[in-house]
């Protein structure tokens, strides 16, 4: 049954747009139903954020800090409930969504540290005064959230934006509306002033209306490259608006020399199939050196991947992974596999739908070595490819043969190999003997090329949430001892 699912100026409201719903990805049972925000709802949310901005920006930082800390405490208190909500909507296992909520809590501490270090106040003494650097909020920021981490990734935009003094209009993915609703209720419970965060639910039309609003001063986005490019075009010619895009990747894992085969296979499994392959840093390409060592690695990879436990989020014992986000997404993944096979790829492990109409998919591994015209696409699911190479220079060239530039990784005991990769890699994240999906919130997160700009959702998020204000200051004014040539007071 539809319910008030928009949060505007501190109140829950019924949307005026079309009704939409969310179902369980595994069994298609209804989970959530409400009306989307139409253009007038979006306008009201942006107006509320604009009206709330002056007072929020002038609120002492210590008060903004305390409110964000209260939100973190509420996340801790409601961790199990929020994790279960995320699991039901995404089908990710409970063990994984509990870590997501914990990451949301940790992001508060990281954001507080980042605000002080990267966007606080600094002063440099000069002979006749001081040079002072301060930072000021942009104003109203639109935040677009993804479905794969519907709590953690929007949180990585919203928390630093609020700390900097911005107000927010949040548009979550239409595939995870309930997680967004539960999260906003915690912000409300934390005592957030009316209008500081507003939420509009809906799909493409809602998003386009928000991006087109003249009341926003910037847009922070995490999601697919296709949507990111669309938003970039929509905001073209508006340099006054900050635009931060974190998009996808066609990431390569280079398996060069193997000391422990099972350790290398575990790293590859974590890189390719964690979250059912629905992380932007997942390895879509595994590059394996030709030879018996590489053959043994691939054989073991297929063996272990074929035995992965897949199931419902609340199953016991817990599965390694659940399904993809929807039955439609599962269909797209199966179509992608079919296309790779039609091009000449060889199925080493065929991805299969485990239940009719369900989003549960088994992992797929396709050898595309020597196959021409393989699409440079991010297949967002449990499907990876194998490409064999002859030498390390060739591996690096293959890794860089993508319009994306998010992550690349190396399995090798040789530091020299990693140093080589660091020099040649075109990627924002370069890992050595660590899963591609591993990242530190204390480090930048993001890439180059079609993977986006700026570094959302991590320590460097503070950079795009405030603009620098430079001042030359002196408490008194005196005539210089030495005047400029041609200037006289005689």
Curated annotation (Swiss-Prot):
Residues that bind NAD(+): 223-228
EC class name: oxidoreductase
GO MF annotation list: succinylglutamate-semialdehyde dehydrogenase activity
InterPro entries named among the record's database cross-references: Ald_DH/histidinol_DH, Ald_DH_C, Ald_DH_CS_CYS, Ald_DH_CS_GLU, Ald_DH_N, Aldehyde_DH_dom, SuccinylGlu_semiald_DH_AstD
EC numbers: 1.2.1.71
Catalyzed reactions: N-succinyl-L-glutamate 5-semialdehyde + NAD(+) + H2O = N-succinyl-L-glutamate + NADH + 2 H(+)
Record keywords: Arginine metabolism, NAD, Oxidoreductase
Biological or metabolic pathway of the protein: Amino-acid degradation; L-arginine degradation via AST pathway; L-glutamate and succinate from L-arginine: step 4/5
Functional description taken from the UniProt entry: Catalyzes the NAD-dependent reduction of succinylglutamate semialdehyde into succinylglutamate.
Protein name listed in UniProt: N-succinylglutamate 5-semialdehyde dehydrogenase
Species this protein is from: Serratia proteamaculans (strain 568)
Lineage: Bacteria, Pseudomonadati, Pseudomonadota, Gammaproteobacteria, Enterobacterales
